[in-house]
Every structure is written in C-alpha cells, then in structure tokens.
Amino acid sequence: MNKKQKKMLTRIIIAFALIVVLSLLPVDGYLEFALYMIPYLVIGYDILKKAFKGIRNKQVFDENFLMAVATIGAILLRDYKEGTAVMLFYQIGELFQSYAVGKSRRNISELMDIRPDYANIEKDGKLEKVDPDEVEIGSVIVVQPGEKVPIDGVILEGTTTLNTSALTGESLPRNAKPGDEIISGCINMTGVLKIRTTREFGESTVSKILELVENSSSRKSRSENFISRFARYYTPAVCYGALALAILPPLVSMGILHMEPQWGQWIYRALTFLVISCPCALVISIPLSFFAGIGGASNAGVLVKGSNYLETLAQTKYVVFDKTGTLTKGVFEVVGVHHNKLEEEKILEYAALAESFSTHPISRSLKNAYGKEIDQNRVSDVEEISGNGVMAKVDGVSVAVGNARLMERIYVKPIECHHAGTVIHVAIDGVYEGHILISDVPKPTSREAIAKLKKNGIKETVMLTGDIDRVAQQVASELGVDRVYSELLPADKVTKVEELLAKKSEKEKLAFVGDGINDAPVLSRADIGIAMGALGSDAAIEAADVVLMDDDPMKIVKAIRNARKCMRIVYENIYFAIGIKVICLILGALGIANMWVAIFADVGVMILAVLNAIRTLFVKKL
C-alpha cells in the first residue's frame, strides 16, 4: 500500500470503530446527530469536498455528487447510521479499487523497470556513469554483471549470460559472445561486456517498448467508449429519476388519491435509488480490465498497442502467416545427407572445407553441420563458380560442391533428390559421392501453435511464401496449415491478404503474423498485424498492432487467449453490474430494497467487478 492508501485505511478503521461504539450507546436526538457526524466527516470529508467542487465547476453529475446527496439526505431523515455506513462502505470500495489499479500499475512498472538509469563509458582507465541519452552511435560502453544493457549494440569483448525475462517473458537465460547483437533492457548476469552502440538511446529497443506501453491507454476499445458515453447520460438520468421518485408519488397521493403524501418514505426510496445507481462498478472495472489485460500480456512478452487492438485480437478467426522467420527459423540447416560409398561425416567434411572461404548462407550451414574447427591450410585452388557452386582441392583431392549444373559441367551425373529443399551435390575426383539436403526448418513449436490455434476456435490458418510450391506444400503439410500460397512477391502478399479480407464476415477478424522484415505493408493491411520477434525492426514495431517480444509461435496463441479472456471478463462485468443494478433499482423504487441493499448494489458489485477485472493480469502458461 502507498501512503495515501494507508491513510485511507486508517480513516476507515476509525470510522468503523466509532459506528460500532455509537450503535451500542443509548443516545438519540441532537446528541446522536452530533456524535454520528464525527465518523461521517472522518470518512467522507473528501467526497463532500469533491462534490462541492464539482457543483462549483458545473460538473455536477458524478459518483461524488451521488454519494454526497444520498448520505446527506439519509442524515436529514435521521437515518444517521445508514448515511454514515453508505459513506464508509463506498470508501472501502474506493480503497479496494485503488489497490487493484495500483497492482496493475506495478505490473506495468515491472516492465518499465527495464529503463536504464545510466551507461558506463571508459575514460582514462576508469568507468564514468553518463546519461544514456548522451551516448552517441558507435561509442563503446561497458556493462558490468547485474547491470541493465542501456543501449542496443554489438558485443566487442566478453562472454556472458543474459536475463531477457523483462523483454520476452521467458525465464531461460541466453548466452552471448563477441560479435552477437545485444538489445537494451536485458540484464547482464555474469561477465563484463564491452559493447559498441548501434543506435541512440531514443531509438533503442527499450525506448520503443516503453513508448508502446505508455501510449497503449490512449487507444480505447468500443467497450470503453460505450461505458464513457453510457456514464455521461446515465448519471444525470438517474439523478432526475431519483428526484421524480421523491416528488411525483407524494404529489399523486395528495392531489389525485387524496392520501397522506408520506414524503419521508419516498425521499428515503429516492436516496436508496441514488446509492444503487452509482456507476462505479462499470466506470472503474471496464478500463481496469483492459489496463490489467495489457499489463498481463506485457509481462508475458506480448505488447498490445491499445485496448482497441485487444478487442480486435479477441475476435480473430483467421490467422495468416508469412513462412520465413515466422513458422520457420529463416536460416538454412542441413536436414539430410544421402551418400554412396563415402561416409556421411566424410562428405560433410569435404563439403565444409571446400566451402570454407565462401560467405554464402549455404556455406555457413555446411560449416555448422560439420561442427568441427576448419583448417583452411588443407584447402587450395579454390574456384567459386557463380550460380553453380565451388571447386577446390582438399588434402590434394579435387572436390566439387554445388548444384546439378556444376555436376554437368564436370561431366558427373547427379542423382535426383525427391525431397523438398536445396540439394547440394558432392563429387570427389570426378566421382559422384552423394548429395546434401539443405532446408529452412520449421521452428520447434510451430506445429503445436497451429494445432492450438485451431483448438481455440481459429477457422482457418493460411501461409504465404515466396518459396517454390513443392517446398511450401511440404512445410504446410508438416505443420498442419490449412491453406498455402507460394511463389509470392511482397506486393502479392498484400493482394492475397486483401482477397482473404473480402471473403470473411465483418465480425470475424483476420490477423497477419510476420517477422517484420518486408512485412510492414501487410501488417498494416490486416485487421490486426502481429510482428513476431520484431524488437530490432522499427518498421515492424511501427506498422504492427501487436508486437511479440521473441520469435516463439506459441506467443500468438497466448496473445489471442489473453485477449479473449480479457473481453470475456469485460462482458461479464457489464452484464453483472447492469443486471444487479436494474434489479435493485426496481426493488428500491418499490420500497423492497433498503439502504443496506443499496450499499451492496454499489460497493459490493464494484468490489466483485474489480476482483474479476484483475484476473486479466494473470496469463496462463500454455
């Protein structure tokens, strides 16, 4: 609890104790009034002050005005205990609401805690702390164990383990070494690092994330806008309704029925009506549900730019994926070695050595698959033939590594491979020894993510790719994707998404998931754009509505489930609060519900709605 909340709790305890004591004392008349005014003013002076200020500023109709009128009216009717109790329980509800909002804000603040306070610059052999804003691109900063990485950069010296949980929501540490890119906001766990900055602080990952979270509250959902409009008209309406309830029945009794007007009874009913009608449960719990939902998602590594996007995400029925970097790793890997007489390891060794001077992605994948240190002294007479492959001598043996065209060039007949992927043929001393199959492999969780999306009510999953149809169909079949469009240019992807948008109903939403590279136009065009692992891509963060902090496809399932849970809680609160209030308003107008029922209909409903709202903070593990 903060200082203000502790002060309020003290006031509540004092007022409650005084009410209990006064209930046991045999006092009446002016003495009873004077004694009850003590707990009433202790607990309610700030509400009365706000109500008076609202009247003075011509902003009359709010919950402070309703509480002030209802409690003062009850006291004028000599219902001192009830009037004081209404104010007491209202303040208990306010304290509870303040605590719930504070808890949500603390969750957001934990994310905000990624903001670095300083950066270390080395000067004359000593470390000097400077403001991260003062560090220029290309500067060398030092990050010691336990410190936050203040600015994006590349590691020059040092190896370490990084804690990225504040960014990705995942607790598993990540190893980092010289040459690796490092993003701001993660915590250096072990070694001392020297980092060359690649961005200014204002453009760094941590700044982008904080900007997203801070601006998320400005984008309101339809539900929030409805509640704002509802409260604007509802509060004056119930005030006039209460006034009518206090005046019209007595006038009808006197003028038409010639009966006793019973002013006290009808004024009491009107005051009960006012207490019941307070819209706190709706006005507080609905924005809190979205606020907590966005906070909970942030802690799970899912940044949602506003509650309107959370609402759209909950209505998603179609999910379109870009293949490379989203469902697949986006890097070539050796997935098979089909050999003749020569051993598999020997073929990989010859291929890796022959390709050791090349910087082509396929060369890197061959060297990674070989997995041993490469001695380039064993390699000579390297000839790289553009578009075909490499010829070289390894340990004095002629080695040719490349495609079928290279084999034909040296008069070697390659064996056709029927598997989807890039085929690298290997010939040694003019004899065909086999081929190596290289492919962009699916991420480990892609298949599970597709299955869980379908289980969670997604009607259709679609994959878009620039790959040839045979490769695309194999990946789609392996992952369980419903439909695939292959051999697409970036502009074609936008066209396909527009076609899919035209086919669905207006209530059903379409999400596009991309890795942020060349995906900005499609992310903008979909009903909701999701950028996966896009921490380093400014264009993706700008264009996307939802940003996943890492490249795990299961985060998409988590994002949709969290959004649906949030919307379910929002509608539960709307139906529950309005339903209870309508019932109690009718009972109050008929004289069946007294002031104690009114207290439950106001404070009780608000507490239950707020308790329900803060459930959105907690994101279940999949």
Model-derived regions: residue spans:
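Actuator/coupling domain of P-type ATPases
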Residues: 29-31, 36-122, 134-136, 140-141, ...
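Flexible metal-binding regulatory segments at protein termini and peripheral loops
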Residues: 1-31, 101, 110, 125-127, ...
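Conserved catalytic phosphorylation-site environment of P-type ATPases
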Residues: 66-68, 167, 268, 278-354, ...
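P-type ATPase nucleotide-binding
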Residues: 334, 338-460, 469, 481-497
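Residue-level signature of catalytic and energy-coupling elements of molecular machines
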Residues: 51, 79, 100, 119, ...
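Bilayer-spanning, highly hydrophobic alpha-helical transmembrane segments
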Residues: 12-16, 225-257, 270-290, 571-600
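Juxtamembrane helix-loop transition segments at the membrane interface in multi-pass membrane proteins
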Residues: 52-60, 99-109, 288-307, 616-622
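Conserved ATP-binding TGD loop and adjacent catalytic N/P-domain core of P-type ATPases
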Residues: 396, 422, 428-572, 580
